[in-house]
Amino acid sequence: MLILFETPGGFAIFKVLNEGKLSNVEDLGNEFSTAKLARKMVKLVAFDKFDNTAEALEAVAKLLEGTPSKGLRKFLKANCVGETLAVADSKLGNIIKEKLKIVCVHNNAVMELLRGIRSQLTELISGLGDQDLGPMSLGLSHSLARYKLKFSSDKVDTMIIQAIGLLDDLDKELNTYAMRVREWFGWHFPELAKIVQDNILYAKAVKLMGNRINAAKLDFSEILADEIEAELKEAAVISMGTEVSDLDLLHIRELCDQVLSLAEYRAQLYDYLKSRMNTIAPNLTALVGELVGARLISHGGSLLNLAKQPGSTVQILGAEKALFRALKTKHATPKYGLIFHASVVGQAAPKNKGKISRSLAAKSVLAIRCDALGDSQDNTMGVENRLKLEARLRTLEGKDLGRLSGSAKGKPKIEVYDKDKKKGSGGLITPAKTYNTAADSLLQTPTVDSENGVKEKKDKKKKKKADDEEEAKTEEPSKKKSNKKKTEAEPETAEEPAKKEKKKKRKHEEEETEMPAKKKEKSEKKKKKKTEV
């Protein structure tokens, strides 16, 4: 029986010298305790060395998929025809058996043999030492990891970080230069700033026109619309601006050239950023767009660092200052950061922006991880998630105000609110009311409805009379009782005014007795004063 063994340097085939010991699997490990015992157990038959790292990577990658490489098939055909081959992978053994017609074996005894060969590998294969095996294993493992992650120079996200930074700087520079052109040329032609709103079109118009006197002779059709051109020419005739020299106009035109060149380079840079984003992060680009995706990568440091972040962090990425201020003051934390500028969040109503940004952040994290570590190079995942988000946005926008969370557990019966509804059916007990056209006629013609109405009124009057008579009967005994109470209370009320009159007389008599005493005291005081004088 032969054994196929894979090493970082190549494929080796060993022959089992003593197959009788394979029956005792537990003691097989003792047969490889020393190099001498190992040489008695197995013997190297053939060795196929890899020429370079690329060949080794290709062979190992095929083995991981469970298929033999082209070199391995040739090697097995040359050395294993008519023999039984022990392999470490049962899937690989099945494919070798189908394609090469070689009987393959995979069991516990084979695994013990492979473990023993690995422990004495440098002794069994001459010319392969530990100093060679270590670097081979390290290089092959790095290459294999790079192959699994599909790492390539196209995936370098440094270009995106630099490009988005330069794009932001260009926007600031363009805005500064354009405002300088408006302020400078505004002294000569101030009305032009209101007529032409776009900065690039303004710079083109100033460069073409120069002095406002030339506006009537020039053709602005390539730059401006017909209506704006006519308005510009009318305003140039009656402008309130001051006159400027040719030297001033020369410098203004040079500044306009700078604005136009910067705008042209910005457009080229944006196209470059677009292509790089579609190459490096296609799923993220499909979800949030090129600019927002590039800013997220730039803020995260790299695409791989961003893939390690959770959805809650990606949601508020760019709003760190507001987050820490809210935590410090114990207020509500922000709901979104850079992700707020995505088109999906912009389409949502203000009350739904928080929900959509949370959903978008969760989907964006999945897209980032797929872009950074996935095998696919297309944007199918991003497009699917964007459609899901748009569907969720439509459901949020169309949801009833009364049912914001979940659905009602129990629905009320219609009979509670509508008494005319039949139980168990949708019909009405009473017939539907129809409009009475006879009520509109001026002639007083008696109708069935009117006669019924008169009868109902008479019945109501009779009922009222009967009710009044009953009330009168009940009120008569109560009146008698009240009259008796009044007669009993009358003598008491008659005695009360007599008592009051007696009290008044006593007070009057007391006041009369006190008055002469007071007069005497006053006269005595006057006499004393006269004597003192």
UniProtKB/Swiss-Prot annotation:
Annotated spans, Disordered: 402-533
Polar residues composition-biased segments: 433-450
Keyword line: Nucleus, Ribosome biogenesis
UniProt keyword annotation of Nucleus present: yes
Main location: nucleus
Record keyword Nucleus present: yes
Matching PROSITE patterns: NOP (PS51358)
GO cellular component: box C/D methylation guide snoRNP complex; nucleolus; plasmodesma; small-subunit processome
Domain of life of the organism encoding this protein: Eukaryota
GO BP, one annotated term: ribosome biogenesis
GO molecular function: mRNA binding; snoRNA binding
Transmembrane residue ranges: none
Pfam families, sorted: Nop, NOP5NT
Biased composition (Basic and acidic residues): 412-423, 474-489, 515-524
Protein name stated in the entry: Probable nucleolar protein 5-1
Organism, as annotated: Arabidopsis thaliana (Mouse-ear cress)
